[in-house]
Design a protein with these regions (language model features):
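Secondary-structure transition/capping residues
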Residues: 40-41, 55, 95, 106
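Short beta-strand His + acidic residue motifs that chelate non-heme Fe in jelly-roll/DSBH
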Residues: 67-69
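Amphipathic alpha-helical dimerization/coiled-coil segments
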Residues: 1-13, 31, 35, 80-112
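Conserved acidic functional residues
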Residues: 23, 56, 89
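N-terminal helix-turn-helix DNA-binding core of bacterial DNA-binding proteins
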Residues: 12-49, 71-83
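Intrinsic disorder/low-complexity signature
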Residues: 20, 52-53, 100
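Canonical helix-turn-helix DNA-binding module
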Residues: 41-65
Length: 112
């Protein structure tokens, strides 16, 4: 995998962010990454095929929600919280609170 393109902060569009967050699996990934940590793709557990999870990760990255980096053969992902907060103040906390209250995306976990 070559280095993926990430949109600059001012290129992050609200419509793309909201569309990306409308899927329960993608919202679950965001909930998992909300602790501020970075996770290897191999650590993510979701009720979808690996190829489908890879697609979800691309949608999140292309929307500007996550940042992916490659180290050797491993890929790591983290939430672009500061960029999202700069662009859309209070959006992410509101979405995370609502998702937590409704338990949306809870099936996405990290490997122990």
């Amino acid at each position: 995998m070559k280095d993926p393109r990430h949109p600059a902060t001012d290129e992050i569009a609200l419509t793309r962010v909201l569309a990306a967050l409308s899927d329960p699996v993608r919202l679950g990934v965001v909930r998992l990454l909300a602790d501020g940590g970075e996770r290897g793709w191999g650590e993510l557990r979701a009720p979808v095929a690996k190829s489908t999870l890879s697609h979800h990760m691309k949608v999140l990255r292309d929307a500007g929600i996550t940042r992916t980096r490659q180290e050797g053969t491993r890929c790591y992902v983290r939430l672009r919280r500061a960029d999202l907060d700069d662009r859309f103040p209070d959006l992410l906390p509101a979405v995370l609170a609502a998702a937590g209250a409704d338990d949306v995306g809870a099936e996405v976990t990290a490997a122990p």
